């Protein structure tokens, strides 16, 4: 191996080239690589953060959906209770109204029956007196007639 001036010149040129590259080419290249690494790392961190935010949002949405369902079920249950209460109140009111109408009808029937009885008593008394007049073939004076009718009405 012969070391000659060409090899020595090539070595010096190579060292200058390496120094030049290390001084002027390497730092911008390393800066670009580091910047790209930083952007990639930031992108991955943002992606991780976005995944966590998505999971949190899904969890919140699920919780809100559960709360909404529970609230809806509670409202439906209250509405059903209120419906049953209204139906019961309406039934009670209808029963009371029915009882009132029945009592009123019975009172009217009783009053009509008493009136008919009284009319019947008077007619029977009048017929009895008329029959007695016919049998006796005589007329009874008005005062006596009144007394007899009143007594017959009281007896009947």
UniProtKB/Swiss-Prot annotation:
Please give the GO cellular component terms listed in this UniProt entry: plasma membrane; proton-transporting ATP synthase complex
Which lineage do the record's taxonomy fields give for this organism?
Bacteria, Pseudomonadati, Pseudomonadota, Gammaproteobacteria, Alteromonadales
Name the principal localization, coarsely classed: membrane
Name one molecular function that GO assigns to this entry.
proton-transporting ATPase activity, rotational mechanism
How this chain assembles, per its entry, is:
F-type ATPases have 2 components, F(1) - the catalytic core - and F(0) - the membrane proton channel. F(1) has five subunits: alpha(3), beta(3), gamma(1), delta(1), epsilon(1). F(0) has three main subunits: a(1), b(2) and c(10-14). The alpha and beta chains form an alternating ring which encloses part of the gamma chain. F(1) is attached to F(0) by a central stalk formed by the gamma and epsilon chains, while a peripheral stalk is formed by the delta and b chains.
Alphabetized InterPro entries for the sequence: ATP_synth_B-like_membr_sf, ATP_synth_b/b'su_bac/chlpt, ATP_synth_F0_bsu_bac, ATP_synthase_B_chain
The identity of this protein, by name, is ATP synthase subunit b
Matching Pfam families: ATP-synt_B
């Amino acid at each position: 191996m012969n070391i000659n001036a060409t090899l020595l010149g090539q070595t010096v040129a190579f060292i200058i080239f390496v120094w030049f590259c290390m001084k002027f080419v390497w730092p911008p290249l390393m800066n670009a690589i580091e910047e790209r690494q930083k952007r990639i790392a930031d992108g991955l961190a943002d992606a991780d953060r976005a995944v966590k935010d998505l999971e949190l949002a899904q969890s919140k949405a699920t919780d809100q959906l559960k709360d909404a369902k529970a609230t809806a079920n509670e409202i439906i249950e209250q509405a059903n209770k209120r419906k049953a209460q209204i139906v019961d109140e309406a039934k009670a009111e209808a029963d009371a109204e029915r009882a009132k109408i029945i009592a009123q009808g019975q009172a009217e029937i009783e009053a009509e029956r008493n009136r008919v009885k009284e009319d019947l008593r008077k007619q029977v008394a009048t017929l009895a007196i008329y029959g007695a007049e016919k049998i006796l073939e005589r007329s009874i004076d008005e005062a006596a007639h009144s007394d007899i009718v009143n007594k017959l009405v009281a007896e009947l």
